[in-house]
């Protein structure tokens, strides 16, 4: 019983469930099993109404102070003797000694001395109904959307949400999984409301029932914590928090149950009146440093295998008993299900059926060239793309999204297509600062808009008038001092396809052979020092405790030994990880020393502003590379072939670009930037 969600506590999606106030007459007419549902109202009452309640006497009737607007003095609890009369109109009982007591006051006193929900009887349920009505926590299949105003202090009504994720049957499944306190893996096609609705649903459950060890024991000792939706990028934090905030009837963050956590936050994003039961939208790095401050941890975009996200999963597995619940959300399990089943001994898989609201058609445009013949393959791809946009053209006032792999390709493809097609072209990727302005121009365009983007648009921004996707099927995978281009994975294909079909029927045109799709093991292309450093902080065993293990374990051990050579204590590493970005491992030496150099370097990592102090701090690390050769790359650029002379990757040959043909040595400032050694 305790793990099943009574239908009177469904989240009001304003389609199948609405706020509702139950009368005592309705309660009397119910079957006993239906009256039992109201017992669970005791938990939100303890948290949100009775937490500030005390007994008063109002015209010879004992009440709770929260039942009246009068300023009455606290009085001693009355002695509870058998009830002999019920006045439903006045909502009060008469006890055997003639004392009058309100339904809610009686329930409050009974629950104060009761430890089992099983012992709550019909007389007590009357007061729970009255208190629950005041909190506006009950729902019914009939009602009005306007009644959602004020549930969380919201000035406007909740949004109407017809998505599958808030259907009553899915609410029950998700609640049962949440209440079991085992890891939950939530899947569902793009467009069913995983990210936009499930966190809102878990916020509702946390508001009602969070902070209690179980839902069969009565206690006024509540360990309330917020929940967190952890995301890989700041853009996602802003996007999804704004969506949830608006859907809950808020126009601003202040005083709402929503809080944001990301680096360099402006004051306008700070909620100074955040509720303890609320939801935090956080970047993975900040989540990792504050993990145990939350009751429920929700990790989104698990299929991306963001490095910090995978570390969070590893830490959660080791300390799962410190969390009330863990939700892993992903569009598809095709690449990860077996590993998740191995990694978590106990886990529940919940799938939200259905896809986007509108159908999505597909078209395949074959490239006759071998992808290994890169020049010929790309040239034909451009021609195919131009012809496909002519054939499968978005309607006026709509847009199409072209997915390419790099920022430089965005520029090249825009130039090629704009010379051949009479449409407006736009570029969106993670380095574009004014994305909202670009989107405004797209929405204001009465004609056809074509957006060229990197994988950034797979999830970071929703383009609401997008009807077509043109997918080259490629992604650039960075690696230390280099990188390579690869075909995408099945989960990335699903994400890209799901960008359309939300407000209108969609079209997905792809230019690659689906047989090329395969999982991408990102850990094999990454700097590994964060895995090692957070293993120190959280006492993880490497590589055994990692969610995804590197193929080359020797490289992992090389990193462990290199970090040991820094001679920095574990306590200092813990402090550094919670205070600095440390994009380049060697920066930790500067941060450990402290002083003005550390302050300047920290500012550089956060803002990109390279001051003289920051430059001097970096130079002190002797991060040099030898220039092996150079050649002209373009009219104004030279490619410098270099060999790294420091760190775990010493000896690696890589390429950087400069406006002049250099010889000698360079000093690396960051992974892809440098200064010449003159």
UniProtKB/Swiss-Prot annotation:
Binding site for ATP: 188-195
Gene Ontology terms: cellular component: virion component
EC number(s) recorded for this UniProt protein: 3.6.4.13
Cellular location(s): Virion
Domain Helicase C-terminal residue range list: 371-546
Alphabetized GO MF terms: ATP binding; ATP hydrolysis activity; RNA binding; RNA helicase activity
Catalysis: reaction(s): ATP + H2O = ADP + phosphate + H(+)
UniProt keyword Nucleotide-binding present: yes
Domain Helicase ATP-binding: from-to ranges: 175-351
Keywords, comma-separated and alphabetical: ATP-binding, Helicase, Hydrolase, Nucleotide-binding, Transcription, Virion
Gene3D superfamilies: P-loop containing nucleotide triphosphate hydrolases (3.40.50.300)
Short sequence motif named DEXH box, residue ranges: 300-303
Cited PROSITE patterns: DEAH_ATP_HELICASE, HELICASE_ATP_BIND_1, HELICASE_CTER
Domain of life: Viruses
Quaternary structure, from the entry: Monomer.
Function, in words: NTP-dependent helicase that catalyzes unidirectional unwinding of 3'tailed duplex RNAs and plays an important role during transcription of early mRNAs, presumably by preventing R-loop formation behind the elongating RNA polymerase. Might also play a role in the export of newly synthesized mRNA chains out of the core into the cytoplasm. Required for replication and propagation of viral particles.
Family named by the database record: Belongs to the DEAD box helicase family. DEAH subfamily.
Name assigned to this protein: RNA helicase NPH-II
